[in-house]
Curated annotation (Swiss-Prot):
Gene3D superfamilies: 2.60.120.20, Picornavirus coat protein VP4 (4.10.80.10). The record marks N69, S70, Q331, G332 as: Cleavage. GO terms for biological process: symbiont genome entry into host cell via pore formation in plasma membrane; symbiont-mediated suppression of host gene expression; virion attachment to host cell. Belongs to the picornaviruses polyprotein family. GO terms for cellular component: host cell cytoplasm; viral capsid. Pfam families: Pico_P1A, Rhv. CDD domains: rhv_like. The keyword Magnesium applies. This is Genome polyprotein.
Amino acid sequence: MGAQVSTQKTGAHETLLEAAQGATINYTNINYYKDAASNSANRQDFSQDPSKFTEPVKDIMIKSMPALNSPSAEECGYSDRVRSITLGNSTITTQESANVVVAYGRWPKYLEDDQATAEDQPTQPDVATCRFYTLESVQWEANSAGWWWKFPEALKDMGLFGQNMYYHYLGRAGYTIHVQCNASKFHQGCLLVVCVPEAEMGCAKPDENVDATNLTNGENTCELTAGAAPAEKGKVQTAVCNATMGVAVGNLTIFPHQWINLRTNNCATIVMPYINSVPMDNMFRHYNFTLMVIPFVPLTSMGGSTYVPITVTIAPMCAEYNGLRLSTQHQGLPVMNVPGSNQFLTSDNFQSPCAMPEYDVTPPLDIPGEVNNLMEVAEVDSVVPVNNLSDNVKTIKAYQIPVSAGDSSRPEAVFKFQLDPGSGSVLKHTLLGEIINYYAHWSGSIKLTFVFCGSAMATGKLLIAYSPPGASAPATRKDAMLGTHIIWDLGLQSSCVLCVPWISQTHYRMVERDEYTTAGYISCWYQTNIIVPPDTPSQCYMLCLASACNDFSVRMLKDTPFIQQEAKLQGEPGKAIESAISRVADTISSGPTNSEQVPALTAAETGHTSQVVPGDTIQTRHVKNYHSRSESTIENFLCRSACVHIARYEAGANASNEDRFVRWEINNKELVQLRRKCEMFTYLRYDVEVTFVITSQQDQGTDLSQDMPVLTHQVMYVPPGGSVTKQGDSYAWQTSTNPSVFWTEGNAPPRMSIPFISIGNAYSSFYDGWSHFSQKGVYGYNTLNKMGTLFVRHVNKETPKPVTSTVRVYFKPKHIRAWIPRPPRLCPYKYKANVNFDVTAITDSRLTITTVPQVEHNLRTA
């Protein structure tokens, strides 16, 4: 029996079945193959929970209440945002906190019985190990680019925690990270404190691999650099603009983070659960996450201390260990007799036979941070490179918006940019821009959060405006205030949100630049001057963060224009609350207000994304929204057949043994479009449907006669560890166990499904660790991603004429689960075996911070 209403959509047509007056709807589900991996993809799953990424805070934050609450203390010039954290026999107190981020909404916990694999009783030292440890301090100066520490490696010499690391084979732990940075009210600057799971880093010399000594220095820090690192063997590419991983540094906010804005707070606190694709791991060779501290606004003071110390204090939580040992050294196929029955459509959704019947897959693991829909990621704030001048696009300065104090009138704009999230140089490489560039159309409201990073003594008012399309960008403040605008009074709440409402004559706008559906302009103006007392920096900075509102949707999936490939990559590698949402949110009618509630003011330092909607800042009408987020589900995003390998093999009297067959170790790293999509998530679990498109040609020669027989091809799948054939006519091809597909030319392309093969609980897109226990061998390589090997040959031993066949292997992941979203790759790929990269500009440049594309609106008469 089914639901009362059943709806099926195909293209622009909709079929509706409704049960009334006691009637029922009966469903028939035909599975032609008994194995779950053979089933077609799951398409209709609308469950979403963006809050684990947008609001991962310990204390519930109410939109209408101030994010930082200290009205009485603000009058005295001091904050009363006190917090005390006790773990073991150690306590930390602070009077300048900005809430606590609980990464992915998960508090650390011990391993559950139904998740465990090791059978020996675990060591759980509790208070002897789970206490605060303080690492070596670093000095923040005006030219500092940033620092990183890798965990648990940074604690290897810290008390009993380090001893247990050495004397146990396996371990796991969560962590409380507390980063402290004390400065006076006359200092200014802003730090991003972020925890990056599986921060696999690239080498400064792309054709080499990094050394362990350059990846981590124990409790001492490793430093980022403002520009590209020297191309030396074993060195990490430390250019801060690409965050050591080939991504835009402004998109690191997809990970658990807080900001230390010296005018607002002096510490950041992040609680990290254990994150991995297996229940436990060797703590010496695998760095589960990396703590990065990056100055987005430089430290500035006038006559005071020229540097400020930054101290990291970290406490393991729920630590447990296993494997005590010696210490280590340092039925038939469906038939459709209709046109199209023998074609291969890369987006089809049919069943295919399973290559491994009765296969017993490993059970899923409860990994924090599961993603169901790309809009969950689009709703997370990321930093916008508003200051993308040519000199800045390869530095952190691209994110710094200068505002300065002055003794005279300031009629000029602070900044302007075109609201073009798909193709505009300012927004296209944010998290929002990267995601919508996988689609042709977008619709919905956009949040822009501005963070003032001047000293606590600086005051002033700014006007931030959205000017709808139809005219040129505003030339004066008078022009700007005619549009949707907000006047921001700088105060304790460091951040102000401009919610750009959806104002359009069409349901969607084009992602590609299009004047008919252009979205308008954003500009900022001095409402009053910025005022500072003596001995206080007069040059201040702002940051801008962008994200989607809950009415945002996309459609018409396509390839992104941000990654290209000319040749195959080389280099071999050695539960949160869910809500079922089928439509985006409606716009609720709102009227004028005069209230002490300030939803537009917030504090980005807390690490949460504001939940402001258009009705909080403008009067709105009720709009019934029928757009859905079905196309942005993870299943739909990844469930398209993509070419992952191309190879040639020959038949004929002159063909050598090596040329008579193809051997390919299955991976998705050679061709960049699918690789980039998969690398937007740290861990993936899926079955894969493999389709083989084989074409043959008769080789050129002096004989002009054509005598091409109908060729039969054999595709053999060998599981990991299976015997490998070295000849095209070996008896290994006459296997009794390895599954083979025999295909004769002229038929529909052969296809098989391969279930989830890994010995772990998920495939790892990145692995910040080593293949050997001694931190030697291959960096970034483990065996969890082994999926087996494919062999292809001609069954015909000889042919009258030399024949060359080309096989194209198409992958379609299905039954997909994804965890821990990541910033999309910015830098071009170099090799398939690592993440090495050349330093790449954050985005395209423009002439000045107020330069916008000029559009002519003259009436054409010709």
